[in-house]
UniProtKB/Swiss-Prot annotation:
GO terms for biological process: regulation of cell shape; regulation of Rho protein signal transduction; regulation of signal transduction. Belongs to the CDC42SE/SPEC family. It comes from Xenopus tropicalis. CDD domains: CRIB. PROSITE patterns: CRIB (PS50108). Probably involved in the organization of the actin cytoskeleton by acting downstream of CDC42, inducing actin filament assembly. It is a lipid-anchor. This is CDC42 small effector protein 2-A. InterPro entries: CRIB_dom (IPR000095), CRIB_dom_sf (IPR036936), SPEC (IPR039056). Coiled coil: none annotated. It comes from the Eukaryota.
Length: 84
């Protein structure tokens, strides 16, 4: 007995080629524009309490560039992850 192969093109969808991401090297990255270093903020600074947050805000405002008066409600929850 012979084999009979029948191909239905209407039922087989061609798989789209995956999009290749363009590789970026250092020569494609420009210098920062309008960058102003105002403060160092570490994770310990924010966990030390609201006084620290307000002092960081005051320090950043004293450096300039923060002319608008914006207020924000900040809620922090401290979770103790130490066992025992």
């Amino acid at each position: 007995m012979s084999e009979f192969w029948l191909c239905f093109n209407c039922c087989i969808a061609e798989q789209p080629q995956p999009k290749r991401r363009r590789r970026i090297d250092r020569s494609m990255i420009g210098e920062p524009t309008n960058f102003v270093h105002t403060a160092h903020v570490g994770s310990g600074d924010l966990f030390s309490g609201m006084n620290s947050v307000s002092s960081i805000q005051n320090q950043m405002q004293s450096k300039g560039g923060y002319g608008g008066n914006m207020s924000a409600n900040v809620q922090m929850q401290l979770v103790d992850t130490k066992a025992g």
